[in-house]
Swiss-Prot record:
Protein name: RNA-splicing ligase RtcB homolog
Source species taxonomy: Eukaryota, Viridiplantae, Chlorophyta, Mamiellophyceae, Mamiellales
Assembly and interaction partners: Catalytic component of the tRNA-splicing ligase complex.
EC primary class: ligase
Originating organism: Micromonas commoda (strain RCC299 / NOUM17 / CCMP2709)
Reactions catalysed: a 3'-end 3'-phospho-ribonucleotide-RNA + a 5'-end dephospho-ribonucleoside-RNA + GTP = a ribonucleotidyl-ribonucleotide-RNA + GMP + diphosphate; a 3'-end 2',3'-cyclophospho-ribonucleotide-RNA + a 5'-end dephospho-ribonucleoside-RNA + GTP + H2O = a ribonucleotidyl-ribonucleotide-RNA + GMP + diphosphate + H(+)
SUPFAM superfamilies: Hypothetical protein PH1602
Physiological role: Catalytic subunit of the tRNA-splicing ligase complex that acts by directly joining spliced tRNA halves to mature-sized tRNAs by incorporating the precursor-derived splice junction phosphate into the mature tRNA as a canonical 3',5'-phosphodiester. May act as an RNA ligase with broad substrate specificity, and may function toward other RNAs.
Gene Ontology annotations for the cellular component aspect, listed alphabetically: nucleus; tRNA-splicing ligase complex
Binding-site residues for GMP, renumbered to this chain: 234-238, 361-362, 410-413, 417, 436-439, 512
Length: 513
């Protein structure tokens, strides 16, 4: 390594770049040594345009020194490569951006047979099972064009939105306990879901190792009033139309038959309950690290051995939060079906309002993967990334056995969204994972300071998009200018072969917290 010319033995930008090498037009490798103690290399997927954002962030970090803010995503990716039990590589997808501990858009898998392998709440995120569901209809854009303002208002009236929004799905503390344990089975039992909804949901809407006793009283207290609510931030319910079909066979299997077909996309997570589960676990894990002598490069990467009581407790509590998020999306699907039924004076069944699929973007799951020719049981952390299993995988629904698992990619407010399908190459390269959305390009703070919410709302109106927002001043944080271009992200994954484009959706109405 060349001479260090920055104070404190820090490397220059050029010296940092010596550790990064392009492997293919869409893939870079981070060599061991980029940060101390790397056990495996890092890999990140970017195209020419997205790599500029990645490297600018690194350059700013070098210029600024280790002062304030999150580390750049590429450093976070490398720090994850130092965790005990990590297998093969630490992976970042094209929508990657800095997060707490792990970057958002980071995938890492840990060997369940290694007694030192860890689980890290930072590798799942605070909004456990933040995810997306798409519901189809048999309506055409022309059926809703004249009434989209009314339809947006109807959705806004039906679905509780915003930061402190409270649910209208009645439940008691005992009901919450059951929902945490049962996930969508609870929704089905209570009449808020159709039996076939479960078939088209990752994990069939229920993590089986959920144990409500591992969820703190404080988390339950936060979760009880928020069941069936949308929340704020980047969460939304959007009425969309099919804009382009890239893979007719896959689209047909999803019940997507024509351009202009009306769809509904719901993006939400586990609200305050999931946040509290993560916070509680981080406190416990800091103690476990001291006890077990686990050292990490960044204290935000607090973790515990998977086999330890803290590791097991977290996985049980995380599963409860995941179940809660599926109940949440099911409740909102129920409310959304009601809103459409009222507006069109037809039953949701007559409107063909079936769930196409429901995916999680923030979760850790035990899966089997082939590593170096050997089948291994791994704990796969996906934070800001989506499971994308290939055709014929046993864990995807019968309907999608020939197409691969549908992967739902939400755009930013007012931009297009995509439905992709999983591929065999993704299974080999990224533990069956792909991107989850656009990925932030500006911090929330920067967006608030640089953008004007009235302008952002005006722009959406000029695009012909009906919008209902509970907290208008939070809109700047979610403006398209705050994010990377979702099409660039999706195309990078498509070109890399880790997922395949099937359908493009365009928004006509947005409901936001």
């Amino acid at each position: 390594m060349g001479v260090m010319d920055l104070p404190g033995g820090r490397r220059t930008y050029a010296q940092e770049m010596e550790f990064l090498e392009r492997v293919t037009p869409t893939q870079w490798r981070v060599r061991e040594g980029f940060v101390p103690n790397m056990r495996v290399p890092g890999v990140f997927y970017v195209n020419k345009h997205l790599e500029t954002l990645m490297f600018d962030e690194l350059r700013q970090h070098v210029d600024r020194g280790d002062v304030g803010g999150f580390l750049p995503a590429v450093k976070q990716l490398a720090n994850v490569a130092c965790l005990p039990g990590i297998v093969s590589k630490s992976i970042a997808l094209p929508d990657v951006h800095s997060g707490y501990g792990f970057a958002i858009g980071n995938v890492a898998a840990f060997d369940m047979s290694d007694p030192n392998a860890v689980v890290s709440p930072g590798g799942v995120g605070f909004d456990i099972n933040c995810g997306v569901r798409v519901v189809r209809t048999n309506l055409h854009e022309r059926d809703v064009t004249d009434i989209k303002e009314k339809l947006a208002q109807s959705l806004f009236d039906h679905i509780p939105v915003g930061v402190g929004s409270q649910g209208i799905i009645p439940t008691s503390p005992a009901g919450l306990e059951a929902a945490l344990e049962m996930g969508m089975d609870w929704s089905l039992r209570e009449g808020y879901a159709w039996a076939e909804d479960k078939e088209h949901c990752e994990e069939y809407g229920r993590m089986l190792n959920a144990d409500p006793n591992k969820v703190s009283a404080r988390a339950k207290k936060r979760g009880l009033p928020q069941m069936g609510t949308l929340g704020a931030g980047n969460h939304y319910a959007e009425i969309q139309v099919v804009d382009e079909i890239f893979d007719k066979h896959a689209a047909d299997k999803m019940g997507i038959e024509r351009l202009g077909q009306v769809m509904v996309m719901i993006h939400s997570g586990s609200r305050g309950l999931g946040h509290q589960v993560a916070t509680d676990a981080l406190t416990e894990m800091e103690r476990a690290m001291a006890r077990d002598g686990i050292l990490v490069n960044d204290r935000q990467l607090a973790c515990a051995k998977i086999s330890s009581p803290e590791g097991q407790n977290y996985l049980s509590a995380m599963s409860c939060a995941a179940n809660y998020a599926w109940v949440n999306r099911s409740s909102m699907t129920f409310l959304c079906r009601q809103a459409f039924a009222k507006m069109f004076d037809q039953t949701p069944d007559d409107l063909d309002m079936h769930v196409v699929y429901d995916v999680s973007h923030n979760i850790a799951k035990i899966e089997e993967h082939v590593v170096d020719g050997e089948l291994k049981t791994l704990l796969v952390h996906r934070k800001g990334s989506t499971r994308a299993f290939p055709p014929h995988h046993p864990l995807i629904p019968v309907d999608y056995q020939y197409t691969g698992q549908p992967v739902l990619i939400g755009g930013t407010m007012g931009t297009c969204s995509y439905i992709l399908t999983g591929t065999e190459k993704g299974m080999e390269e990224t533990f069956g994972s792909t991107c989850h959305g656009a990925g932030r390009a500006r911090s929330r703070n920067n967006s608030r300071n640089k953008l004007d919410y009235t302008e952002v709302l005006e722009k959406l109106k000029t695009k012909g998009i009906a919008i209902r927002v509970a907290s208008p001043k939070l809109v700047m944080e979610e403006a398209p200018e705050s994010y990377k271009d979702v099409t660039e992200v999706v195309n990078t994954c498509h070109d890399a072969g880790i997922s395949k484009k099937a359908v493009k959706l365009r928004p006509i109405a947005v409901v936001k917290g």
